[in-house]
Regions:
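Amphipathic, non-transmembrane alpha-helical secondary structure
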Residues: 111-121
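Short proline/glycine-enriched turn/loop motifs at strand-loop junctions of beta-rich domains
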Residues: 5-12, 19, 39
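Short, solvent-exposed loop/turn segments at secondary-structure junctions
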Residues: 9, 101-104, 135-136
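Residues that line or immediately flank small-molecule/substrate-binding pockets and catalytic motifs
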Residues: 16, 103, 132
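Short beta-strand elements bearing conserved aromatic residues within extracellular beta-rich modules
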Residues: 12-14, 44
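Aromatic-lined carbohydrate-binding/catalytic grooves of carbohydrate-active enzymes
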Residues: 120-142
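The feature marks proteins involved in alpha-glucan
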Residues: 1, 21, 27-98, 103-108, ...
Length: 142
């Protein structure tokens, strides 16, 4: 089951690359639902109204191609955790860097940001706080 809140449209479709669009069903209070199972990594998005533009999932946990592109389904339960003994890092005395993924690199992706983490370590950063990754009005989502 996948849901999206789109209160001001008369029609919502779920779009996945290489597959036919799936008409979503109005579920009340602006919510739309589709009884579709997505596997970890499946790309998808929504088409609102009579348009044809793909919109990312505003509740997505993964945007591999940037905030304006298709979302990718993330199944946290399928991940095999191997670090149960890790206790985290001490916050006291740490240096926190507030990172906005959309502007930290030209690509605006987490993968591109990770490639620059060594620089943050070199300047003394001990913790990274991701700024909100959900969409806001404007070009850069702020």
């Amino acid at each position: 089951m996948i849901e999206v809140w789109a209160p001001r449209v008369e029609r919502v479709r779920l779009r996945r690359p290489g597959l036919d669009d799936v008409a979503m069903v109005a579920a009340g209070d602006g919510w739309w639902r589709a009884d579709v199972a997505l596997a970890d990594g499946d790309e998808y998005g929504f088409v609102l109204g009579e348009g044809d533009d793909l919109r990312p999932d505003p509740r997505s946990r993964r945007q591999p191609h940037g905030v304006h592109e298709a979302s990718a389904w993330f199944d946290a339960a399928s991940f095999s955790w191997t670090d149960v003994a890790w206790t985290g890092r001490q916050l006291a005395g740490g240096l926190i860097y507030e990172l906005h993924l959309g502007t930290f690199t030209p690509e605006g992706t987490l993968d591109a940001a990770i490639a620059r983490f060594d620089h943050l370590i070199d300047i003394g950063v001990t913790h990274i706080e991701l700024l909100p990754v959900n969409a806001f009005n404007g070009t850069h989502n702020w």
